[in-house]
Amino acid sequence: WDYASNVSSERLTRLANSGAEHLYVCPGVQGWNQLINKYHEAYENISRMARYGHECHAMGLLNTDWGDYGHINHPDFSRIGMIYGAAFSWNADILPEEEINRQISVLEFGDASGKLVSVLDLLCHQDAYPWRTAVMVQEALELHQDKEEAAELLRSCAEGDADAANASI
């Protein structure tokens, strides 16, 4: 398994070349700690892992959907990533991202414009206060009783610097 959007084939190739049998690739739908899944990252991860699986003659693809801290995203938001996995695991000719997103928008969601998945992908990157940060602040307040740590996290988020807030965790 590897959930990075820029995952390389190195580890899977080493396993395949070592004679390991029963290889599976396990990408993810990119919904953990997210209200709306990260669809571009899911496309990159799932398409790469599926391609590597085809190249290394993997027995299958296990597309994962899991969550941290309560799995806050609605299961319907994972459908797009699940469709990526279904399409790519059975067909080595992987569609370009824009085309499969258009097809999913039309076929799965009945969106005649073909733009719904692209809009959802924009929305998933608009969180001003990431769920992971909210959980860490809560833990700092309740578990560690570290009010200064929680205050620093809140300041970083209030200043719009979610990356700094997450880095301080």
What do these predicted regions represent?
Residues 1-169:
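Substrate-binding groove of N-acetylhexosamine-processing glycoside hydrolases
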